[in-house]
Amino acid sequence: KVMQSDIPIIRLLSVAPWVVLIVILTITTNFTSRPIWRLLRWLNPSLYPDLNGTWEGEIILEDGKAIPARAVIRQNLVQAQIDLHTKTSKSLTLETTPVIEAGQCKIYYTYRSQPSNVKWPSYTGSTILDVRNSAIKKTTPLELSGYYFTDRKTCGRISLKQTSTKTDVEVSYY
């Protein structure tokens, strides 16, 4: 026999999984998280910018040689993924952490790079990318730049500019 006081608990237990599912889908899919992000940024422009999109730029090696680079950034309210491609390698995200330090937006980015030549070993790298122009003008494209360091004991500079807000674009060179 079910007591009258147990009925609200039973209702809560039958509704709670659906509420959790809706919340998870809302914060993890671009379909819902990007409009929420746009609204929140409209209400408070100092919030972290939406980095979703296609990016182009260059990687400057420690010897000064510049290599063209393209990237796609996919970001939702929970995580960010950066796929960075050059003619000689492609880098996949191991970890990203967006932060705001002293009013400056940054993204801590750790990646594994796979060279196009299968005889070359893969390597990992890390960089702190500064996010620029996010609060200056809405018409100015966002820019990312920072120094990188790899476990091969190499270093250099990454510089990217957002060319589109589309994330379903192929940026691979090979």
Predicted feature residues:
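Central antiparallel beta-sheet cores of small beta-barrel/beta-sandwich binding domains
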Residues: R38-Y174
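N-terminal alpha-helical membrane-insertion module
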Residues: K1-S46
